[in-house]
């Protein structure tokens, strides 16, 4: 509906959300290549380099990240479509995600089989994503992963763990990382299990503060983490225990 063609590179610059996951799955169905970008990137060099290097034709962007794109929009003439996740006044050349969905429903009502044929025609060696390295020591490198890379990782992971369809997980890691991709939602989708994402706040700190409440709401069977995040969780728990007094802290240590 947006004119995106098979093989086109489409970036996603947004906080982790259900809309993020749905956007990428939609790109795969259209035969496009997803270019997930970290929300920590600054527009001056980091974003410009990656979007130019990947030859991005379109972009899904959250309302919180949109100001970055607006500041460099004139330097990205090859970007033809900007789809905005979230409610915010739009400028020329920007389309709300809700509008795109309506256009998509209308397109599918007239071209359903034509569209589904694109997805059926995707091969194992077709590109799925281009994920960029941090670029701390040199220019970032675009790591190309095929659809078979992902399905193989899912198969290998499921040979080591069992995920019943009744399981739930809450993704607290950035979705631009391959680990969150494979174990966070592709494994869950393959098993028919449930994926939830953290409620996005106006700032990264606000989003972090939503995690405990979201855990209580979702009651996940497991969480994905990385050492740095696990360390921060431990510090937060220990700080909370100490605040309750020596007796509580002593019982915690004994446990």
Q: Where are these predicted regions, by residue range?
A:
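Conserved AMP-binding/adenylate-forming
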Residues: 1-41, 172
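Conserved S/T- and glycine-rich ATP-binding loop of Class I adenylate-forming
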Residues: 10, 27, 59, 127, ...
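ATP-dependent adenylate-forming carboxylate-activation enzymes
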Residues: 14-15, 32-49, 63-68, 195-217
């Amino acid at each position: 509906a947006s004119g995106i063609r098979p093989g086109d590179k489409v970036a996603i610059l947004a906080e982790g959300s259900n809309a993020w996951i749905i956007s990428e799955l939609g790109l795969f169905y259209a035969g496009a290549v997803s270019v997930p970008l970290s929300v920590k990137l600054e527009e001056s060099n980091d974003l410009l380099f990656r979007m130019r290097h990947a030859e991005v034709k379109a972009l899904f962007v959250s309302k919180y990240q949109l100001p970055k794109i607006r500041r460099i929009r004139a330097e990205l003439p090859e970007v033809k479509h900007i789809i905005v996740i979230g409610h915010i006044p739009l400028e020329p050349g920007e389309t709300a995600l809700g509008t795109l969905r309506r256009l998509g429903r209308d397109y599918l009502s007239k071209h359903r089989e034509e569209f589904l044929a694109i997805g059926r025609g995707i091969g194992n060696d077709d590109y799925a994503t281009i994920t960029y390295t941090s670029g701390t020591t040199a220019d970032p490198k675009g790591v190309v992963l095929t659809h078979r890379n992902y399905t193989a990782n899912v198969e290998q992971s499921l040979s080591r763990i069992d995920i019943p369809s009744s399981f739930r997980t809450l993704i607290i890691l950035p979705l631009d990382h391959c680990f969150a991709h494979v174990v966070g939602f592709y494994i869950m989708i393959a098993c028919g299990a449930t994926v939830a994402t953290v409620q996005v706040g106006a700032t990264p700190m606000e989003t972090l503060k939503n995690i405990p409440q979201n855990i209580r709401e979702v009651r996940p069977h497991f969480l994905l983490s990385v050492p740095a995040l696990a360390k921060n969780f431990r510090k937060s728990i220990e700080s909370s225990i100490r605040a309750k007094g020596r007796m509580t802290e002593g019982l915690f240590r004994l446990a």
